Amino acid sequence: MKKVGILVGREKTFPEALIRNINERGRGEVTADYIKLGGIRHDAPPGYDLVIDRISHEVPFYRATLKRMALEGTIIINNPFWWSADDKFFNYSLAPKLGVAVPKTVLLPQKDYMSGISSESLRNLEFPLDWQGIVDYVGFPSFLKPFDGGGWKNVSKVNSLEELWKEYDQTGTLCMTLQEGIDFDQFVRCYCVGQEEVMIMAYDPRKAYLSGEQYIHNPDYLSPELADRVRKDVRTLCSALGYDLNTVEFAIKDGVPYAIDFMNPAPDAELASVGEFYHNWITSAVTNLVFKRLGEEREAPRYRWDALLNPEPTRTFAVASQVEQQSRTVVPGPVENSMAAAASAPISSEVSSVNSESSVEATKPSARKPRKNGKTSSPRSKTT
């Protein structure tokens, strides 16, 4: 018998439907339930063959536990190692290299820093920050949002430099991005399951988040040609990022889909939010993915970061303790040979040139000056 564990937060209808579907289809050979976790021993058996993670991004204890389970060969949807390493600004930088359009985006230094970080710790930061150059590049309206956030948390629309400063001053220690606002003709949110199955959903981001009014069931919302491009871009992004469950949002302007957000490894799937049609689709698609992954031949993972970051369905470990090697079967040849080849292969590097624009002295600097309490922040001085 194989066991599937569901790790959840506040959501109810999606995990309950998923557990019901898996148990009905599994007929006792595959069972699903909610995981219960307490103190975890470092050498504890995982207890589950596959885990669907919906909440570890908000609970570090869960994330650490999932990494431990992955080490023992448990399939985790989504991969906790990559999820921990990923961020949205990296994704925005990656997408154009994959042929996917994105809005102009700038990563900003933090407004504040934790206690103990002084101006001496920040000597690599430019001072003053060229705010005018940044907004000239991005334009208005634009969106100030965390470089690794989700769920529309701490996202602000700004229409002027003054509004930007006001919102930026409230961001504290969050690292933020400023992103071009696309005056879209159409907007879609797309489920992607198993890096293959795609459901395009008409979506209105102007409606209240989780209100049940954002998702619109309209199969003919996009032209066939545009729908094909969107599906292609979704699969390209999710395959490159390694996410088996994700959503990708596109703001479409003049026939061009701009990828706005594509780091959503625990996407909303609640019945009241997405509606019955999309709820049933995502539940069915994830159920199919579970049985597909459980049916794939898998070996114990190699105990190396790169192998855990990008596991393959069939993986034979090549780096393990002598005791474990005596108790498990090691298949010599291809794995060891490929590792040796990889170790001796030259590392290619791509050097990209950066076009420097003439700097316009900022009206509001972002370098940090020490406060009396030991914290640092952006001063509000102005230059003339």
Residue positions per predicted region:
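A short, polar/charged loop-to-alpha-helix boundary motif
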Residues: 207-215, 269-276
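Short, solvent-exposed loop/turn segments at secondary-structure junctions
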Residues: 11-12, 57-58, 83, 149-150, ...
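Conserved N-proximal alpha/beta basic substrate-recognition cap immediately N-terminal to
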Residues: 9-121
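Beta-strand scaffold of nucleotide-dependent catalytic cores
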Residues: 167, 177-179, 187-204, 258-263
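Active-site nucleotide/adenylate-binding loops and adjacent lid/helix of ATP-dependent enzymes
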Residues: 2-8, 70-73, 81-188, 216-220, ...
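Intrinsically disordered, polybasic Lys/Arg-rich low-complexity tracts
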Residues: 336-384
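A long amphipathic alpha-helix within ATP-dependent nucleotide-binding catalytic cores
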Residues: 210-258, 281-284, 288-298, 303-319
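A short beta-strand motif that forms the metal-chelation/ATP-contact edge
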Residues: 48-51, 190-192, 256-271
